[in-house]
A protein has these predicted regions:
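PLD/PLD-like phosphodiesterase catalytic module centered on the HKD motif
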Residues: 1-141, 173-292
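Short, charged beta->alpha transition segments
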Residues: 141-149
Protein backbone atom coordinates (compact mmCIF):
# COMPACT_ATOMS: atom_id res chain seq x y z
CA UNK A 1 0.00 0.00 0.00
CA UNK A 2 2.97 2.32 0.61
CA UNK A 3 5.46 2.73 -2.21
CA UNK A 4 9.15 3.39 -1.54
CA UNK A 5 10.95 5.44 -4.20
CA UNK A 6 14.62 6.15 -4.69
CA UNK A 7 14.88 9.86 -5.58
CA UNK A 8 18.08 11.18 -7.12
CA UNK A 9 19.41 14.08 -4.99
CA UNK A 10 20.15 16.17 -8.10
CA UNK A 11 16.44 16.19 -8.99
CA UNK A 12 15.77 18.43 -5.97
CA UNK A 13 18.76 20.70 -6.53
CA UNK A 14 17.73 22.66 -9.63
CA UNK A 15 15.37 25.15 -7.95
CA UNK A 16 13.25 25.61 -4.84
CA UNK A 17 10.18 25.17 -7.02
CA UNK A 18 11.34 21.73 -8.16
CA UNK A 19 12.35 20.83 -4.61
CA UNK A 20 8.88 21.69 -3.28
CA UNK A 21 7.08 20.03 -6.18
CA UNK A 22 8.65 16.66 -5.51
CA UNK A 23 8.74 16.74 -1.70
CA UNK A 24 5.03 17.54 -1.58
CA UNK A 25 4.29 14.38 -3.57
CA UNK A 26 5.53 12.20 -0.72
CA UNK A 27 4.31 11.19 2.72
CA UNK A 28 2.80 8.08 4.29
CA UNK A 29 -0.72 9.52 3.89
CA UNK A 30 -0.19 9.74 0.12
CA UNK A 31 1.08 6.17 -0.12
CA UNK A 32 4.56 7.25 -1.25
CA UNK A 33 7.79 7.71 0.69
CA UNK A 34 11.33 8.64 -0.30
CA UNK A 35 13.95 6.07 0.61
CA UNK A 36 16.86 7.63 2.46
CA UNK A 37 19.27 6.05 0.02
CA UNK A 38 22.08 6.33 0.73
CA UNK A 39 22.24 7.28 4.41
CA UNK A 40 23.75 10.68 3.56
CA UNK A 41 20.95 11.47 1.07
CA UNK A 42 20.17 14.86 2.66
CA UNK A 43 23.82 15.86 2.48
CA UNK A 44 23.92 14.89 -1.19
CA UNK A 45 20.84 17.04 -1.92
CA UNK A 46 22.39 20.05 -0.21
CA UNK A 47 25.75 19.63 -1.93
CA UNK A 48 24.04 19.43 -5.33
CA UNK A 49 21.96 22.51 -4.50
CA UNK A 50 25.10 24.37 -3.43
CA UNK A 51 26.71 23.62 -6.78
CA UNK A 52 23.69 24.94 -8.68
CA UNK A 53 22.35 27.72 -6.46
CA UNK A 54 25.21 29.05 -4.34
CA UNK A 55 24.61 32.62 -3.19
CA UNK A 56 20.88 32.58 -3.90
CA UNK A 57 17.86 32.77 -1.61
CA UNK A 58 16.64 29.52 -3.14
CA UNK A 59 19.56 27.65 -1.60
CA UNK A 60 18.64 28.97 1.85
CA UNK A 61 15.03 27.95 1.37
CA UNK A 62 16.05 24.46 0.27
CA UNK A 63 18.34 24.15 3.30
CA UNK A 64 15.48 25.04 5.65
CA UNK A 65 12.98 22.68 4.03
CA UNK A 66 15.56 19.90 3.89
CA UNK A 67 15.98 20.08 7.67
CA UNK A 68 12.20 20.00 8.13
CA UNK A 69 11.53 16.82 6.13
CA UNK A 70 9.73 14.41 8.45
CA UNK A 71 10.20 10.69 8.94
CA UNK A 72 6.88 9.96 7.23
CA UNK A 73 8.26 11.54 4.03
CA UNK A 74 11.90 10.42 4.09
CA UNK A 75 12.00 6.86 5.37
CA UNK A 76 15.13 5.23 6.71
CA UNK A 77 16.12 2.80 4.00
CA UNK A 78 18.11 0.27 6.07
CA UNK A 79 19.86 -0.60 2.80
CA UNK A 80 23.60 -0.65 2.09
CA UNK A 81 24.67 2.52 0.31
CA UNK A 82 26.72 0.82 -2.37
CA UNK A 83 30.01 2.07 -3.79
CA UNK A 84 30.25 5.76 -2.95
CA UNK A 85 32.66 6.28 -5.84
CA UNK A 86 29.91 5.38 -8.32
CA UNK A 87 27.22 7.77 -9.60
CA UNK A 88 24.02 7.78 -7.55
CA UNK A 89 21.91 6.15 -10.27
CA UNK A 90 24.37 3.27 -10.67
CA UNK A 91 24.23 2.66 -6.93
CA UNK A 92 20.43 2.84 -6.91
CA UNK A 93 20.11 0.37 -9.79
CA UNK A 94 22.50 -2.05 -8.08
CA UNK A 95 20.41 -1.89 -4.91
CA UNK A 96 17.19 -2.16 -6.96
CA UNK A 97 18.45 -5.43 -8.45
CA UNK A 98 18.94 -6.81 -4.94
CA UNK A 99 15.89 -5.37 -3.15
CA UNK A 100 13.59 -3.50 -5.54
CA UNK A 101 12.30 0.00 -4.93
CA UNK A 102 8.82 0.83 -6.20
CA UNK A 103 10.64 3.01 -8.70
CA UNK A 104 13.67 5.24 -9.24
CA UNK A 105 13.22 8.94 -10.06
CA UNK A 106 16.23 10.51 -11.78
CA UNK A 107 17.31 13.33 -14.06
CA UNK A 108 17.91 10.95 -16.95
CA UNK A 109 17.77 7.28 -17.87
CA UNK A 110 20.88 6.45 -19.91
CA UNK A 111 20.34 2.69 -19.63
CA UNK A 112 16.63 2.91 -20.56
CA UNK A 113 15.77 0.93 -17.43
CA UNK A 114 12.00 0.35 -17.23
CA UNK A 115 11.83 1.25 -13.53
CA UNK A 116 13.62 4.60 -13.88
CA UNK A 117 11.30 7.60 -14.23
CA UNK A 118 12.72 10.81 -15.66
CA UNK A 119 11.83 13.65 -13.31
CA UNK A 120 10.77 16.24 -15.93
CA UNK A 121 8.33 13.75 -17.47
CA UNK A 122 6.83 12.49 -14.23
CA UNK A 123 3.17 13.00 -13.41
CA UNK A 124 0.44 11.31 -11.43
CA UNK A 125 -0.86 9.47 -14.49
CA UNK A 126 2.24 7.27 -14.64
CA UNK A 127 1.09 3.94 -13.16
CA UNK A 128 4.55 3.41 -11.71
CA UNK A 129 4.09 6.55 -9.61
CA UNK A 130 0.41 6.21 -8.76
CA UNK A 131 -0.36 5.61 -5.10
CA UNK A 132 -3.44 5.84 -2.92
CA UNK A 133 -4.05 6.77 0.70
CA UNK A 134 -7.09 4.51 0.98
CA UNK A 135 -7.71 0.98 -0.15
CA UNK A 136 -10.28 -1.76 0.22
CA UNK A 137 -8.69 -5.03 1.31
CA UNK A 138 -9.75 -8.59 1.87
CA UNK A 139 -9.69 -9.21 5.61
CA UNK A 140 -6.89 -11.74 5.64
CA UNK A 141 -4.10 -11.45 8.18
CA UNK A 142 -1.58 -11.01 5.37
CA UNK A 143 -3.43 -8.11 3.75
CA UNK A 144 -4.06 -6.40 7.09
CA UNK A 145 -0.35 -6.47 7.92
CA UNK A 146 0.93 -5.79 4.40
CA UNK A 147 -0.83 -2.40 4.36
CA UNK A 148 1.77 -1.14 6.85
CA UNK A 149 4.51 -3.68 6.13
CA UNK A 150 7.01 -1.07 4.99
CA UNK A 151 6.51 0.82 8.26
CA UNK A 152 6.79 -2.30 10.41
CA UNK A 153 10.09 -3.13 8.73
CA UNK A 154 11.50 0.20 10.01
CA UNK A 155 9.62 0.48 13.30
CA UNK A 156 11.04 0.82 16.78
CA UNK A 157 7.63 1.06 18.47
CA UNK A 158 4.32 -0.34 17.22
CA UNK A 159 0.84 0.17 18.68
CA UNK A 160 -1.99 -2.23 17.81
CA UNK A 161 -5.24 -0.52 18.78
CA UNK A 162 -8.51 -2.45 18.76
CA UNK A 163 -11.11 -2.29 21.57
CA UNK A 164 -11.88 -6.00 21.24
CA UNK A 165 -8.36 -7.38 20.74
CA UNK A 166 -8.22 -10.93 22.08
CA UNK A 167 -5.12 -13.00 21.23
CA UNK A 168 -6.80 -16.22 22.35
CA UNK A 169 -8.96 -15.95 19.24
CA UNK A 170 -7.30 -17.11 16.02
CA UNK A 171 -8.62 -14.16 14.02
CA UNK A 172 -6.47 -11.77 16.08
CA UNK A 173 -3.65 -14.18 16.83
CA UNK A 174 -2.83 -14.77 13.16
CA UNK A 175 -2.37 -11.05 12.53
CA UNK A 176 -0.39 -10.63 15.76
CA UNK A 177 1.97 -13.45 14.77
CA UNK A 178 2.71 -11.79 11.43
CA UNK A 179 3.43 -8.44 13.08
CA UNK A 180 5.77 -10.05 15.60
CA UNK A 181 7.59 -11.91 12.82
CA UNK A 182 8.22 -8.67 10.91
CA UNK A 183 9.45 -6.93 14.04
CA UNK A 184 11.77 -9.83 14.81
CA UNK A 185 13.33 -9.49 11.37
CA UNK A 186 13.52 -5.71 11.04
CA UNK A 187 17.07 -5.54 12.38
CA UNK A 188 16.44 -3.12 15.23
CA UNK A 189 17.29 -3.77 18.86
CA UNK A 190 14.83 -3.07 21.64
CA UNK A 191 11.63 -3.11 19.57
CA UNK A 192 8.40 -2.63 21.54
CA UNK A 193 4.93 -3.80 20.55
CA UNK A 194 2.01 -2.26 22.43
CA UNK A 195 -1.49 -3.74 22.40
CA UNK A 196 -4.28 -1.32 23.33
CA UNK A 197 -7.76 -2.67 23.99
CA UNK A 198 -10.81 -1.74 26.03
CA UNK A 199 -11.45 -2.55 29.66
CA UNK A 200 -14.89 -3.96 28.93
CA UNK A 201 -15.69 -5.21 32.41
CA UNK A 202 -14.02 -8.60 32.00
CA UNK A 203 -12.64 -9.79 35.33
CA UNK A 204 -8.95 -8.78 35.65
CA UNK A 205 -7.87 -12.39 36.11
CA UNK A 206 -9.66 -13.41 32.92
CA UNK A 207 -8.25 -10.46 30.98
CA UNK A 208 -4.78 -11.35 32.21
CA UNK A 209 -5.24 -14.94 31.05
CA UNK A 210 -6.08 -13.73 27.52
CA UNK A 211 -2.52 -12.49 27.20
CA UNK A 212 -0.56 -14.72 29.60
CA UNK A 213 -1.76 -17.82 27.76
CA UNK A 214 -0.65 -16.61 24.34
CA UNK A 215 1.95 -13.82 24.29
CA UNK A 216 4.84 -15.75 25.94
CA UNK A 217 4.41 -18.54 23.37
CA UNK A 218 4.66 -16.32 20.28
CA UNK A 219 6.79 -13.36 21.41
CA UNK A 220 10.21 -13.49 19.70
CA UNK A 221 13.38 -12.67 21.62
CA UNK A 222 14.28 -9.00 21.34
CA UNK A 223 10.69 -7.78 21.08
CA UNK A 224 8.93 -6.64 24.24
CA UNK A 225 5.13 -6.65 24.40
CA UNK A 226 3.05 -4.34 26.58
CA UNK A 227 -0.72 -4.47 27.06
CA UNK A 228 -2.79 -1.37 27.86
CA UNK A 229 -6.45 -1.16 28.88
CA UNK A 230 -8.64 1.88 28.20
CA UNK A 231 -12.21 2.80 29.17
CA UNK A 232 -14.60 1.15 26.72
CA UNK A 233 -16.40 4.42 25.95
CA UNK A 234 -13.12 6.04 24.87
CA UNK A 235 -12.26 3.40 22.27
CA UNK A 236 -13.92 3.31 18.86
CA UNK A 237 -11.36 3.26 16.08
CA UNK A 238 -8.82 0.62 15.11
CA UNK A 239 -5.26 1.48 14.18
CA UNK A 240 -1.83 0.09 13.54
CA UNK A 241 0.59 2.86 14.47
CA UNK A 242 4.37 2.85 14.22
CA UNK A 243 6.84 5.56 15.15
CA UNK A 244 7.08 6.43 11.42
CA UNK A 245 3.36 6.47 10.52
CA UNK A 246 0.24 4.38 10.60
CA UNK A 247 -3.18 3.41 9.26
CA UNK A 248 -6.77 3.11 10.43
CA UNK A 249 -8.87 0.00 9.85
CA UNK A 250 -12.59 0.68 9.68
CA UNK A 251 -13.71 -2.81 10.72
CA UNK A 252 -10.96 -4.21 12.93
CA UNK A 253 -7.53 -5.77 13.23
CA UNK A 254 -8.99 -9.27 13.28
CA UNK A 255 -9.11 -11.25 10.04
CA UNK A 256 -12.05 -13.04 8.44
CA UNK A 257 -10.19 -16.16 7.39
CA UNK A 258 -12.73 -18.31 9.23
CA UNK A 259 -15.56 -16.70 7.26
CA UNK A 260 -17.73 -15.53 10.15
CA UNK A 261 -17.54 -11.76 9.70
CA UNK A 262 -17.25 -8.93 7.18
CA UNK A 263 -15.08 -10.08 4.25
CA UNK A 264 -13.51 -6.71 3.38
CA UNK A 265 -12.25 -3.59 5.13
CA UNK A 266 -11.38 -0.01 4.20
CA UNK A 267 -7.86 0.97 5.25
CA UNK A 268 -6.79 4.63 5.38
CA UNK A 269 -3.22 5.84 5.76
CA UNK A 270 -3.02 8.59 8.38
CA UNK A 271 -2.05 12.19 7.73
CA UNK A 272 0.80 13.51 9.86
CA UNK A 273 -1.58 15.52 12.09
CA UNK A 274 -4.01 12.65 12.64
CA UNK A 275 -1.14 10.28 13.34
CA UNK A 276 0.33 12.65 15.94
CA UNK A 277 -3.04 12.96 17.70
CA UNK A 278 -3.62 9.21 17.87
CA UNK A 279 -0.03 8.53 18.94
CA UNK A 280 -0.39 11.01 21.81
CA UNK A 281 -3.79 9.60 22.80
CA UNK A 282 -2.30 6.14 23.15
CA UNK A 283 0.86 7.16 25.01
CA UNK A 284 1.71 7.86 28.63
CA UNK A 285 -0.51 5.20 30.21
CA UNK A 286 0.44 2.54 32.75
CA UNK A 287 0.73 -0.92 31.23
CA UNK A 288 -1.63 -3.69 32.37
CA UNK A 289 0.85 -6.43 31.46
CA UNK A 290 4.48 -6.40 30.24
CA UNK A 291 6.30 -9.29 28.57
CA UNK A 292 10.09 -9.00 28.23
Amino acid sequence: MIKEFALEPDVLATSFRDFSYFIEKFGVAQGRVISRFPKDWKKMVYQAAQANLRGTRELSRIEIRLKEIKDDVLLESRRPGGDGAQPWQSRALAEHASLPFSGIIALDNPTAHPDVMISVDLDGADPRFQAFGQRHINRTSNEIVDCVGLLLDRAKTVKLIDPHFNPTRARWRRMLGLVLARLKNNGQAGVTLEIHRSDDGTLPANMQSYFDSTIPNIRPAGVSVQVFLHPLAAMHNRFILTNVGGASYHTGLDDNEDGNSTPTDLVSLLSADTFSTEWATHSGHAAFRIYL
